[in-house]
Amino acid sequence: MTNMRKNHPLMKIINHSFIDLPTPSNISTWWNFGSLLGLCLGIQIITGLFLAMHYTSDTLTAFSSVTHICRDVNYGWIIRYLHANGASMFFICLFLHVGRGIYYGSYTYSETWNIGILLLFAVMATAFMGYVLPWGQMSFWGATVITNLLSAIPYIGTDLVQWIWGGFSVDKATLTRFFAFHFILPFIIAALVMVHLLFLHETGSNNPTGIIPDADKIPFHPYYTIKDALGFLLLISLLLTLVLFSPDLLGDPDNYTPANPLNTPPHIKPEWYFLFAYAILRSIPNKLGGVLALILSIAILAIMPLLHTSKQRSMMFRPISQTLFWILVADLLTLTWIGGQPVEHPFTIIGQLASFLYFFLILVLMPACSLIENKLLKW
């Protein structure tokens, strides 16, 4: 009898991707975050689908419909908070996944890396539009401020903003289209994930040493399915702890006030996972310059393969590069803190210095340091 797992057209794809996949024997827990991101996406799509059954994308009833979900729908409160805090978990896993890619030189698989950057942009766009849907104060003003940035584009800026708004301000048309895009984008993300995995399986996974591991590979199942299952358990435990004990910890109290175009909140700020980019945006006095810096803060990842000057792939055996990497991490945490602070002294100057350091580290210091390490190792 033929083995169905290896011969059936559909099962064969699953088998080659998750069961008989040759995997490096030494990949660490840092390689768990890809599967955890898949879990997060699954949680977000399922909880989002149930929320969409009860949500109404109308400016008059959106806020009330979210309240109705929490108060009247069976287990609506847990679905809503799983979705809201699931987004935070998604971004924690994303940042760790990208950080691992930078540290271990995974960006040298340029196709996989570039699809990953597209995924990052798509997830950020989805999260931004999702934040607008409850139609609280921060939803409305966040949407107004961020969409208004497009007006900085010369000549077509104002027309572009009004086209996105569907009128002369953020209103019913904006909310309806944001809901439509927020619903469809996760499925586009799921398709991009398939492409991401397709390119990854063309080359095989990287590993902590950065050395080609063809001589020492093991099947994905059962070794890494068990390892991923432990990650799933920890992630779900963390998410449920957050949802059941402190569901509003990462949210903004202003979003419990219905949107009011006549009353501006004292500090307009996005969700915590956008604060680093928001700090970079605010640190440049010129509007167009700020918008460009905001886009470049993520797009800069695309030129990382070009900036790789080291003869070694991974940072595992490069202590100077490791130091710079952890300075970059500290810098991003500083930017996240600054993004949540008011625009006043000393936060302004700290934000400007941290923004400069972010680009200087990636564009100048890290490539220069790699060249120095090559000399020290006589490579």
UniProtKB/Swiss-Prot annotation:
Predominant location: mitochondrion
Single Gene Ontology MF annotation: ubiquinol-cytochrome-c reductase activity
Residues engaged in binding a ubiquinone: 201
PROSITE patterns: CYTB_CTER, CYTB_NTER
Membrane disposition: Multi-pass membrane protein
SUPFAM superfamilies membership: a domain/subunit of cytochrome bc1 complex (Ubiquinol-cytochrome c reductase), Transmembrane di-heme cytochromes
Binding site for heme b b562: 83, 182
GO cellular component terms listed in the entry, alphabetical order: mitochondrial inner membrane; respiratory chain complex III
Cofactor list: heme b
One Pfam family here: Cytochrom_B_C
GO biological process: mitochondrial electron transport, ubiquinol to cytochrome c
Binding site for heme b b566: 97, 196
Transmembrane portions of the chain: 33-53, 77-98, 113-133, 178-198, 226-246, 288-308, 320-340, 347-367
UniProt cofactor note: Binds 2 heme b groups non-covalently.
Keywords for the protein's UniProt record, in alphabetical order: Electron transport, Heme, Iron, Membrane, Metal-binding, Mitochondrion, Mitochondrion inner membrane, Respiratory chain, Transmembrane, Transmembrane helix, Transport, Ubiquinone
Localization terms from the record: Mitochondrion inner membrane
Misc note: Heme 1 (or BL or b562) is low-potential and absorbs at about 562 nm, and heme 2 (or BH or b566) is high-potential and absorbs at about 566 nm.
Assembly with partners or alone: The cytochrome bc1 complex contains 11 subunits: 3 respiratory subunits (MT-CYB, CYC1 and UQCRFS1), 2 core proteins (UQCRC1 and UQCRC2) and 6 low-molecular weight proteins (UQCRH/QCR6, UQCRB/QCR7, UQCRQ/QCR8, UQCR10/QCR9, UQCR11/QCR10 and a cleavage product of UQCRFS1). This cytochrome bc1 complex then forms a dimer.
Family statement drawn from the similarity comment of this UniProt entry: Belongs to the cytochrome b family.
The protein's role, per its UniProt record: Component of the ubiquinol-cytochrome c reductase complex (complex III or cytochrome b-c1 complex) that is part of the mitochondrial respiratory chain. The b-c1 complex mediates electron transfer from ubiquinol to cytochrome c. Contributes to the generation of a proton gradient across the mitochondrial membrane that is then used for ATP synthesis.
The protein's name: Cytochrome b
Species annotation: Ochotona collaris (Collared pika)
Gene this protein is translated from: MT-CYB
